[in-house]
C-alpha cells in the first residue's frame, strides 16, 4: 500500500491564491483593488476630463467668424467641443425655441412675438450682438472681370424690382463710364435666398429705406416675394453658400450676400451709393465708419425688440458703407437648470466671455468682419453673467 498522500482540493485552492498574490506583488501596475476584488477603481489624476459639447445653430451671416472663433478657442480649451450648424436665422430661432440647440444665432434681433414663444418655456431668453458684418452686392459679368461695378440707390432697387432688365441699360452705363462699353446686352439674373434668412432681412430692410416702391410693393423680412421670380429672372439658393455658388457658376447673375462669402469665393463686390451720395466699397475702414456714425440703441438682453432694428443701415458719412449690421446671439438664463447642466452652463459662459473680449481682437477676426464697439460688447458680457450654473 502506497504511503504518499494525494493533494486535496483545499491545497489546490491555496496554491492558486498564492499565485495570484505573487502576481500582485510582482506586477505593480495591477491595482490592489483589482487583485482583491470589490468596488470600482477610481479614475487616476492623469485621465482627461470629459468633453463638453456646445451646439450652436442659425445664421450663416457670421459663419466664417464663428468657425474662426471655434478654431481659436478650442486650441486652448481642448475639453470643449463646439458644433456649428447653419440653416439661417429663422431656423436658428426655431431650434432655440424647441431646445434643439444651446446657442441660437440670428442676424435680425428677435421681435416680441417670437420672444413670447421663448418665455413660454419657463426660462428667460437673452439676446445681444456678437459681431459686425456687411451685406454686399456681388455679380458675375465675364466681360468686365473683377472691375468694380457702381450701383446708385435707385438703380440697385430697380434691378431687384426687375425694372432694369439688361446689364447694358443706359442707367447702369451712365454711372459706370469706365466700363460702359464692356457691359453686355444680357439679361440680369437675380439670385436670392430660398430659406428664412437674416441676410435677406438686412438687405430688404435697406432696400425699403432707399426705395419707396420697394417698401410698398415688397417690404422687408427674412423671406419676401421676389419680383424677379414672377418674370422668370429670379433664382434661389439655400444659405449664403448656396447663393454665392450660383453666382460663381452662372454668368450675368447678381446677388446679395455677407462680405466674408464674397471674399472667400473671390467674387467682385459693387461700390454702393451711400447716404452722402458717395460710391463706397465694403472694407474694414468703411464698415467702421458706419459703426461710428450711428449710436445704436440696443434693448436690455432680457427684452424682445419692438421692431427689426435698423441699427447701422444707411449710416451718414462720406466713407460709410451703407449696409452694415450686427448679428445676434441667443442663450438661456437657465433658471433652475432648465436648459443647461452646471458644467455646460459654465462652459457656455466661458466661451461667450472669450468671444466678447479676446474674440473681438483683430487676431481673432475673420476677413469681412469688424469687432463690436466696447459699449455694445459690455451689453453682451452683462447678459452672459446672468446665465445660471
Swiss-Prot record:
It comes from the Archaea. Phosphate binds at residues 59-61, 89, 107, 197-199. Signal peptide: none annotated. Part of the ABC transporter complex PstSACB involved in phosphate import. Coiled coil: none annotated. It is a single-pass membrane protein. It is found in: Cell membrane. The keyword ATP-binding does not apply. Its main location: membrane. It comes from Methanocaldococcus jannaschii (strain ATCC 43067 / DSM 2661 / JAL-1 / JCM 10045 / NBRC 100440). Belongs to the PstS family. It holds the Pfam family PBP_like_2. NCBIfam families: 3a0107s03. This is Phosphate-binding protein PstS. SUPFAM superfamilies: Periplasmic binding protein-like II. The complex is composed of two ATP-binding proteins (PstB), two transmembrane proteins (PstC and PstA) and a solute-binding protein (PstS). Keywords: Cell membrane, Membrane, Phosphate transport, Transmembrane, Transmembrane helix, Transport. InterPro entries: ABC_phos-bd_PstS, PBP_domain, Phosphate-bind_PstS.
Amino acid at each position: 500500500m502506497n504511503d504518499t498522500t494525494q493533494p486535496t482540493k483545499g491545497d489546490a485552492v491555496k496554491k492558486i491564491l498564492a499565485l495570484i498574490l505573487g502576481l500582485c506583488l510582482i506586477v505593480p501596475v495591477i491595482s490592489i483593488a483589482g487583485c482583491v476584488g470589490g468596488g470600482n477603481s477610481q479614475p487616476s489624476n492623469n485621465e482627461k476630463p470629459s468633453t463638453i459639447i456646445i451646439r450652436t445653430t442659425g445664421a450663416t451671416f457670421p459663419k466664417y467668424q464663428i468657425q474662426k472663433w471655434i478654431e481659436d478657442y478650442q486650441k486652448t480649451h481642448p475639453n470643449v467641443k463646439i458644433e456649428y450648424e447653419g440653416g439661417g436665422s429663422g431656423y436658428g430661432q426655431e431650434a432655440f425655441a424647441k431646445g434643439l440647440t444651446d446657442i441660437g444665432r440670428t442676424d435680425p434681433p428677435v421681435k416680441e412675438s417670437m420672444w413670447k414663444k421663448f418665455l413660454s418655456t419657463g426660462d428667460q431668453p437673452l439676446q445681444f450682438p456678437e459681431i459686425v458684418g456687411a451685406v454686399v452686392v456681388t455679380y458675375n459679368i465675364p466681360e468686365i472681370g473683377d472691375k468694380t461695378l457702381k450701383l446708385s440707390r435707385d438703380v440697385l432697387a430697380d434691378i431687384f424690382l426687375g425694372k432694369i432688365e439688361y446689364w447694358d441699360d443706359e442707367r447702369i452705363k451712365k454711372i459706370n463710364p469706365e466700363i460702359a462699353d464692356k457691359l453686355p446686352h444680357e439679361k440680369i439674373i437675380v439670385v436670392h435666398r430660398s430659406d428664412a434668412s437674416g441676410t435677406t432681412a438686412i438687405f430688404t430692410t435697406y432696400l425699403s429705406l432707399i426705395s419707396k416702391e420697394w417698401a410698398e410693393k415688397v417690404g422687408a423680412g427674412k423671406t419676401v416675394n421676389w419680383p424677379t421670380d414672377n418674370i422668370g429672372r429670379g433664382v434661389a439658393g439655400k444659405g449664403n453658400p448656396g447663393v454665392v455658388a450660383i453666382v460663381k457658376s452662372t454668368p450675368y447673375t447678381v446677388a446679395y450676400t455677407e462680405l466674408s462669402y464674397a471674399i472667400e469665393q473671390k467674387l467682385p463686390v459693387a461700390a454702393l451709393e451711400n447716404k452722402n451720395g458717395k460710391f463706397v466699397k465694403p472694407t474694414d475702414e468703411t464698415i467702421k465708419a458706419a459703426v461710428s456714425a450711428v449710436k445704436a440703441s440696443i434693448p436690455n438682453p432680457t427684452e424682445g425688440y419692438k421692431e427689426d432694428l435698423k441699427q447701422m443701415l444707411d449710416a451718414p458719412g462720406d466713407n460709410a458703407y451703407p449696409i452694415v449690421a450686427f448679428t445676434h446671439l441667443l442663450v438661456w438664463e437657465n433658471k433652475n437648470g432648465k436648459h443647461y447642466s452646471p458644467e455646460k452652463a459654465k462652459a457656455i459662459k466661458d466661451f461667450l466671455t472669450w468671444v466678447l473680449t479676446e474674440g473681438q481682437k483683430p487676431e481673432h477676426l475673420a476677413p469681412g468682419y469688424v469687432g463690436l464697439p466696447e459699449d455694445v460688447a459690455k451689453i453682451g458680457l452683462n447678459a452672459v453673467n446672468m446665465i445660471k450654473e
